[in-house]
Amino acid sequence: MAVLASWVWVLAGCFCAAVAEVSDSSDPYPPLWEDSPEQLSDYMMEDGNYIINPWVYTDRMGMYRILLEETAMYFAKYGPENEQNLLWGLPLQFGWQYQSGRLADPTGMTDCGNELNESLCVSVDSWWADINYYLSVIPFLAAVDSGITGISPNQITILPPPKDQMRFCYNVSDCQSAVPGTMNRWRDFFQYMQLNSSDFDGLLNYLWEAHASSLDYPTSAFGDRYNFYSEKEANFEENWAIAVNYLAAARLPTTQNRTYSFQRGLPPRVLVDTDIAPFIPDFTPLQNEVLVSLKLLGDTDRNSGSLSLTLWENLMSTKLARTLFLKAFEEFLATSS
């Protein structure tokens, strides 16, 4: 438990140091945000259907942008300009994956994401892209099915990747069969959002339940993708997926500025075997420290058989505990500024 606590407080320090670094940022948006579809009519249409290719960066980002637009009214009471919308965590995370080269073909066998003329290509061989598929297409389809966009799910056509087509789902009925728990949790989130009685803490709870559920299938289904990466990057991927469960228990608010700030601590490129944190020379001290913290968490989780996660979930089971934890973020921020 002491090891777990040390990771939590190190990560809290990393988070707040990152917030302090970019608190004056005037552009907390993902790359190519303005070039991504803002409304469904910005996508190509065929036979009355909107055609979305999630293997093109801007097409996939467009699904997030539309979700942010369509759900803005439900977050207006929590702050201006949609900044408090909890869905910001998804496009900002996807944008970091793109900017750091993690959506490109890790095998090097194609130009996808690796050459200028293929810069928007999202590779089906990318572990990050495959995991993110279930954090983009699934919530989007669940939102459409929940009436958020005002159109029928039958009006959406999701295009398949060039290979491994059977490892993905493409419409509401198929995804409901393939990942029923995940679809249900995202639908619960969007339906709860539309209730007059919904509140911020309730939204956080539903969001993180859906987010964590979204990783259940792909993290097991795409384990073969680890073979395409260095041991250091593969280990980082495993640790990142583990960390999501701990962040979910703490219900960290994935608002725009918080998420954008936090990501300054994430590695700016794909890791190679010679990278040894905290001594990676082209990474900032913060980025090095985050890698060390994530490794500590991952090792603790694996060595304890996830008992550490159970203990952490029990610790974070009350609103008071979560409030105190979030307050610690603010205290670290105050001392860092």
From Swiss-Prot:
Cellular component GO terms, alphabetical: extracellular space
A Pfam family it matches: Leg1
Residues glycosylated per entry: N171
Disulfide cross-links: none
The entry's keywords: Developmental protein, Glycoprotein, Secreted, Signal
Subcellular compartments: Secreted
Keyword Methyltransferase attached: no
Signal peptide (UniProt feature, chain positions): 1-20
Protein family membership: Belongs to the LEG1 family.
PANTHER family (alphabetical): LEG1 (PTHR18820), PROTEIN LEG1 HOMOLOG (PTHR18820:SF1)
General function of this protein: May be involved in early liver development.
Protein name: Protein LEG1 homolog
Lineage: Eukaryota, Metazoa, Chordata, Craniata, Vertebrata
Designated gene of the protein: Leg1
